[in-house]
């Protein structure tokens, strides 16, 4: 429960910060964190984020990924949601994308990684 609450607050914070940065650059970019264990709560979070980005005519969605993995069925739902959007998607692998995280990353249009 704490993880879901943390994800929701982080998502709201990133939306606010992402929107303020995008306003300065006149681009509509959304950053969606996918961190910690991939469980069955994450797909609805990602679907909601994609829906918000679509309704706001976003040009780009960046998925900030740092996970050891988790449930493959949840990752498959996330993959399907990412594949269904017409918005350009980027997986930013911030340290690790193992197992389910790899599947999610591969569903994006582009993948970028940090060292390590």
Task: Locate each region found by the language model.
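Bacterial N-terminal signal peptides
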Residues: 9-18
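Bacterial N-terminal signal peptides that target proteins for export
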Residues: 1-9
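Eukaryotic low-complexity, proline/serine- and acidic-rich intrinsically disordered regions
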Residues: 2, 21-22
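Soluble extramembrane regions of membrane proteins in the secretory/endomembrane system
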Residues: 22-116
């Amino acid at each position: 429960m704490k993880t879901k609450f943390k994800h929701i607050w982080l998502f709201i914070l990133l939306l606010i910060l992402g929107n303020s940065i995008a306003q300065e650059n006149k681009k509509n970019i959304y950053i969606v964190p996918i961190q910690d264990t991939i469980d069955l709560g994450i797909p609805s979070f990602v679907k909601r984020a994609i829906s918000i980005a679509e309704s706001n005519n976003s040009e780009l969605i960046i998925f900030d990924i740092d996970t050891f993995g988790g449930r493959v069925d949840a990752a498959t739902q996330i993959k399907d949601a990412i594949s269904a959007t017409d918005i350009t998607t980027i997986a930013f692998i911030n340290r690790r994308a193992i197992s389910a995280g790899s599947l999610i990353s591969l569903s994006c249009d582009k993948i970028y990684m940090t060292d390590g």
